[in-house]
From Swiss-Prot:
PTM per Swiss-Prot/TrEMBL: One or more lysine residues are methylated.
GO function terms (MF aspect): large ribosomal subunit rRNA binding; structural constituent of ribosome
SMART domains referenced in this protein's UniProt entry, alphabetically: RL11
SUPFAM superfamilies: Ribosomal L11/L12e N-terminal domain, Ribosomal protein L11, C-terminal domain
UniProtKB keywords: Methylation, Ribonucleoprotein, Ribosomal protein, RNA-binding, rRNA-binding
Domain of life, per lineage: Bacteria
TM spans (from-to): none
Cellular component terms per the entry's GO annotation: cytosolic large ribosomal subunit
Protein name listed in UniProt: Large ribosomal subunit protein uL11
Length: 141
């Protein structure tokens, strides 16, 4: 029989920069998990992922051990990097803050494909395009 799961946490932590300060420390400390052990393991696994925030799902077991799964960076972070902007538009219908080509859309969709709820690359591109439009980014063919 496997270990008994007592909790699951979802956090977004900068790649390679996990430390015991909030939000990591308090979230893990409440569940009596070894914070430094998690930080070292997370930083080692994400050191080559650039400066993105990385979504992580931490499964905590009854014996206070843990496992974690890292996901790909959020679509909005990938879009901001591709469009070379720091934040989306405050009014996406009126103010356009950047442009993306369909090739860039496809690259983002390929990167994020395993995390998206899409059956093929075309559906993934539509999801990414919708996120880009809601940020005030124009899509060019």
């Amino acid at each position: 029989m496997g270990k008994k799961v007592v909790g699951e946490l979802k956090l977004q932590i900068p790649a390679g920069k996990a430390n015991p300060s909030p939000p990591v420390g308090p979230a893990l400390g409440q569940r009596s998990v070894n914070i430094m052990e998690f930080c070292k393991a997370f930083n080692e696994r994400t050191k080559d992922m650039g400066d993105f925030n990385i979504p992580v799902i931490i499964t905590i077991y009854q014996d206070k051990s843990f496992t974690f799964i890292t996901k790909k960076p959020p679509v909005t972070d990938l879009i901001k990097k591709a469009a070379k902007i720091t934040k989306g538009s405050d009014n996406p219908l009126k103010n356009k803050v950047g442009k993306l080509t369909s090739k860039q859309l496809e690259e983002i969709a390929q990167t994020k494909m395993e995390d998206l709820n899409a059956s093929d690359i075309e559906a993934a591109k539509k999801i990414v395009a919708g996120s880009a439009r809601s940020m005030g980014i124009e899509i060019q063919d």
